[in-house]
Amino acid sequence: MSARIIDGNALAARVRGEIAARAAALTDRGTQPCLAVLLVGENPASAVYVRSKVAACEKAGIRSLRFDYPQDVDPAVVMEKLAALNADPSVHGILVQLPLPPQFDEAAVLEAISVAKDVDGFHAENVGRLSQNQEAFLPCTPHGVMKMLEAEGVPLAGAEAVVIGRSNIVGKPMAMLLTNAGATVTVCHSRTRDLRFHTGRADIVVAAIGKPRFVTGDMLKPGATVIDVGINRITDGPEAGKLCGDVDFASASEVAGLITPVPGGVGPMTITMLLENTVISAERSARAAGK
């Protein structure tokens, strides 16, 4: 068996076209969607992510505001900026790029963002709404995965799904979204015993653990849908510098029915969902203003 590859770039391009049309319609009515991005420190990976988000905004017709702070900035300065952005009606989405330097309380920073502008979906109220299957801004990576599964027509109701990883950013919300869709979900992590037992019976496997090529083909049920959320850079050997996921693509693609590549799989959809959340926020703002 050779798995069919889920092309995240193609799906993202299609969805971004729809988002751009919605953004243009809003702008024509006097409300241009706007995303504010705050970057603290000089983490190279964070800087790359922020540049990608800003560039994606520009292409979609979404205005972006970028605020950069030094590594040693007083957290009070950032909190003051968040308060100002919360109060600015022209700003519809606010994103603080993680991770933050050690002097910050990340949870407090995320809670300081207005729920109505929390386009990353990390505020406790949005997480709570997700857990109750209520309308909420959804975390972008799990939301992107759900869009991919929907686009591929993967049956979720009654499916056995395994999520490997329990982070607040991916693992936990991913499990909640799959549960809300009717799947029977098992969350596995570093203390899970006999991981192969769980993955071997799963119709859907979502790998989000940050370990290069950890999930191999012999761990999978034939025909399974495999979603690789990981992105790792190989640091040594002949493949040094190359990006790979948490799934060993070569072996897994011989067993799976559907599989996402790295790069070009989940990554493009993550930023796409950020754009969609920003436009949704702007649409709500326009409706409230009678535009």
Swiss-Prot record:
Gene Ontology BP, a term: methionine biosynthetic process
Residues the entry annotates as binding NADP(+): G165, R166, S167, S190, I231
Family assignment from sequence similarity: Belongs to the tetrahydrofolate dehydrogenase/cyclohydrolase family.
SUPFAM superfamilies named in the record: Aminoacid dehydrogenase-like, N-terminal domain (SSF53223), NAD(P)-binding Rossmann-fold domains (SSF51735)
Name of the gene: folD
One Pfam family linked to the record: THF_DHG_CYH_C
NCBIfam families: PRK10792.1, PRK14186.1, PRK14189.1
Subunit structure: Homodimer.
The organism's taxonomic lineage, starting at the top: Bacteria, Pseudomonadati, Pseudomonadota, Betaproteobacteria, Rhodocyclales
Protein name as catalogued: Bifunctional protein FolD
